[in-house]
A protein has these predicted regions:
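Active-site neighborhoods and metal-handling regions in enzymes and metal-associated proteins
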Residues: 1-316
Length: 316
């Protein structure tokens, strides 16, 4: 196995290669715009004109180099890596449990900052700091607080709004703990929510619960769980406000396959860890969401996040 390391950003990984399948580490310019280094190494391995499998994230430039310079037949083989990552062993499950515990603790510790007048960006910075305090190396993705209300800005993306009375604060964050990701979500209401907001919260909880409970009934696929959760929203008349898939597997990457999504026919097997994250989004009104990491077990499931899902209201 030849390991290509970006010279500027990747040299710190060298100590971790001992005892692995890697037989040679090659330093490359970051970025290697010409591809000269890795094309040379691939030729030395005798891969000119051969069949080369790549993952789905490879750049179009790299594919063209393999085809035109190396004269290789290139096919996408991500399913091989996906299948190896999908089912976690006991050590990996232990790390996922610990990381979910950390996410719960971060949520608990960030709550005192949720008050009118606080800037959202300050909260996001503090969440990142808390993850590091609890042993995470970095965020598992660019998490955010989705703050929606009458005068709020964009639904997603960098959010610099202040928290105000009558707004919802929907968390979506995670940390990287010993190479494994967490992904977490809860919603906080700033001031007493009206009946409509309470109903939205109840629907989100029901959509998640119904999907999880289906895991106890026998074999399930990502599409089956997605259909159950979306069905709850459709029946309640808020289907168009559930604007995304129900979830995704998670582990080394925050978004792994199989997805909990339409068209996903892969069976969810014991040892797989995945998110279940229904939401209701109403622009200029609210984002109500919940997200937990779930472990598929022989008898159903284990929810790795243990912190309360009860409705949370802060004084305004």
């Amino acid at each position: 196995v030849v390991y290509f390391i970006p010279r500027l950003t990747g040299m710190g990984t060298l100590p971790f290669l001992e005892g692995t399948a890697v037989t040679k580490a090659v330093s490359i310019q970051d970025p290697d715009l010409t591809g000269e280094t890795w094309i040379r190494e691939l030729k030395a391995l005798g891969l000119s004109g051969k069949h080369i499998g790549v993952n789905r994230d490879i750049s179009a430039q790299a594919v063209l180099m393999l085809q035109n310079v190396l004269e290789a037949k290139v096919t996408e083989e991500s399913d091989l890596v996906d299948s190896l990552r999908a089912v976690k062993d006991e050590e990996e499950i232990g790390l996922m449990r610990k990381n979910a515990e950390i996410a719960d603790q971060v949520y608990h510790e960030i709550m005192p900052m949720i008050r009118p007048g606080e800037r959202v960006r300050n909260i996001e910075r503090e969440i990142e700091r808390l993850f590091e305090t609890h042993g995470c190396s970095c965020p598992s993705f660019p998490g955010e607080c989705i703050v929606l209300g009458p005068n709020s800005g964009p639904i997603f993306g960098m959010n610099y709004d202040k928290i105000e009375k009558g707004y919802t604060v929907a968390f979506d964050f995670g940390g990287m703990y010993q190479g494994y990701c967490s992904d977490f979500g809860r919603t906080v209401f700033v001031g007493e929510p009206d009946k409509e907001l309470i109903r939205y919260h109840e629907l989100v909880m029901k959509a998640q619960s119904d999907a999880m409970e289906a895991l106890k009934s026998g074999p399930c696929t990502g599409q089956m769980l997605n259909d159950i959760a979306h069905g709850v929203m459709e029946e309640a008349g808020v289907g168009p406000n559930f604007i995304h898939r129900l979830g995704h597997c998670i582990g080394k990457d925050v978004h792994e396959r199989p997805f909990i999504a339409p068209g996903e026919q892969t069976e969810l097997k014991p040892g797989m860890t995945f998110t279940v994250e229904p939401s209701i989004v109403v622009v200029k009104r609210c984002c109500v969401r919940v997200e937990d990491v779930v472990l598929r077990t022989e008898t159903g499931y284990e929810c790795l996040n243990k912190i309360t899902k009860d409705i949370v209201v802060v004084e305004a």
